[in-house]
Amino acid sequence: MTTTTRMDYETTLKGKYPAKRHAQRVADYIRNKVPGASGVLYLEGRATKLLEDNDEAEPFRQRRYFYYLTGCPLADCHYMYDIDADKSTLFIPPIDPESVIWSGLPVSADEAKQNWDVDEVKYTSDVNATLAHVGSEKPKGASVFAIPNQVSDKITFLEFDNKNFSILKEAIEVTRVVKDEYELAIMAKANEISSDGHKAVMQKVKHVQNERELEAVFLGHCIAKGSRNQAYHSIVASGRAAATLHYVPNNADMAGKLNLLLDAGGEWDCYASDITRTFPINGKFTKESREVYDIVLKMQNDCIAALKEGVLWDDVHLLAHKIAIDGLLQIGILQGDKDEILESRTSVAFFPHGLGHYLGMDTHDTGGNPNYADKDTMFRYLRVRGRLPAGSVITVEPGIYFCNFIIEPFLKDPKHSKYINADVLEKYWDVGGVRIEDNLVITKDGTYNLTTAPKDPEEMEKIIQQS
């Protein structure tokens, strides 16, 4: 069962990001893997870095591992969690009087303690002394757990017998898969802002000339609603460009083209949304475009209906291919026995990517265990392999594409060409590509759909026509 009622995320977001609970979950994972583990977790936030040959800072993006245990978006911070004492300490940069005139006063220790879910706040000048003090009081065999290549040269772990650089990253990546109520509330807010942004683009699509104007509409909407950062570079692909999965130029004129594929999602508090809609530029799908759209919509609806806790994602991806084959047979692009087509993997020519991926602080979030060396082309680019736990968030983004570069080798290979009607296919190149993508929370009995952007074909046509 899929629920689409809007979440009351604002009430939840009045509280603090549950960083302490995240630290406890990570520590539990480590203790399960390393029985009797004692010591501290140590993490560093992203450091300020200047642009090459320039005195201006690079755009800042907080390290996700650090954010997961702190909720702190500041640069140049450090963090320590004492596993045995269940105590978290955030270290923030001290006040630099010379920078105040340029940047204003930074967050104070008292403000940081009030803002974020940590037990203690100190300044970064105290990191080594604090580590040394805590380490000296630990029993023999205590460890400091850290992430390779994310420890500054100035940091020392001299008082700890063991330095473990192998398990902390894994522990955080696995723990991040299952979201808590607060994380889901953040993602619901990111989705609502981005969903409304997609609708805003639909309302403008027939009034502009170039893809970049629509990118500006989406970005402007997100920024106006407080979502300044994008989860990824927007894909604004008109006409045949929609057959390029990660098209990023976003600068082509749209005159004479049929459809627009918009894959765009803003962030809220370091958490991503990832939404795709495909709609007619002039407000009315052509016969061929609507046929393909209906196939993809059925792929998505049926796959969402199959989801619940414990479902094998591989099976849902396979279901999407079966529905694609049935639909392409019905409109005549494919021909022959559907089981033979499935076995031959000919449908990969039209649906070459995985059905979806985990979503969280990263667009392609952690914990999916993909196998990009899989010899089976149908599953090679599936970013999640295994069963879905309740509380995970996954994208469901089936698509059908008409990319000459991908399809041409299939047409030249007798193993596949016998299943493709090239004459019928010729009518569909200008459709470009159709993808529909929503963000789903897995529950015990089904899913909760975070995405509210319109996707009913008649509704989208009406929005565009009445704009």
Curated annotation (Swiss-Prot):
Which GO MF term does the entry hold, naming one?
manganese ion binding
Cysteines paired by S-S bonds: none
Record GO biological process? proteolysis
Free-text cofactor note: Binds 2 manganese ions per subunit.
Sorted keywords for this record are: Aminopeptidase, Hydrolase, Manganese, Metal-binding, Metalloprotease, Protease
Q: Which residues bind Mn(2+) 2?
A: 263, 274, 437
Enzyme class, first EC level, given as a word: hydrolase
Catalyzed reaction equations: Release of any N-terminal amino acid, including proline, that is linked to proline, even from a dipeptide or tripeptide
Cofactors demanded by this protein: Mn(2+)
| Chain residues that bind Mn(2+) 1 | 274, 397, 437
Per the UniProt entry, the Enzyme Commission number(s) are: 3.4.11.9
Purpose of the protein? Catalyzes the removal of a penultimate prolyl residue from the N-termini of peptides.
Q: Please give the family membership noted in the entry.
A: Belongs to the peptidase M24B family.
Q: Which PANTHER family match?
A: XAA-PRO AMINOPEPTIDASE 3, XAA-PRO DIPEPTIDASE
* Name recorded for this polypeptide: Probable Xaa-Pro aminopeptidase SMAC_04549
